Amino acid sequence: MLTLKIFVYTVVTFFVSLFIFGFLSNDPGRNPGER
């Protein structure tokens, strides 16, 4: 049970950091014509 919780926390943290990094890095390059 503890291993499952650690695995879930690791996956959630990984996806959150990946989403934040992708949003920050792709925000100016995703729509360069709007700004």
UniProtKB/Swiss-Prot annotation:
It is a single-pass membrane protein. It is found in: Plastid, Chloroplast thylakoid membrane. The keyword Nucleotide-binding does not apply. GO terms for biological process: photosynthesis. Keywords: Chloroplast, Membrane, Photosynthesis, Photosystem II, Plastid, Reaction center, Thylakoid, Transmembrane, Transmembrane helix. One of its GO terms (cellular component) is photosystem II reaction center. Belongs to the PsbI family. This is Photosystem II reaction center protein I. It comes from Oltmannsiellopsis viridis. The lineage of its organism: Eukaryota, Viridiplantae, Chlorophyta, Ulvophyceae, Oltmannsiellopsidales.
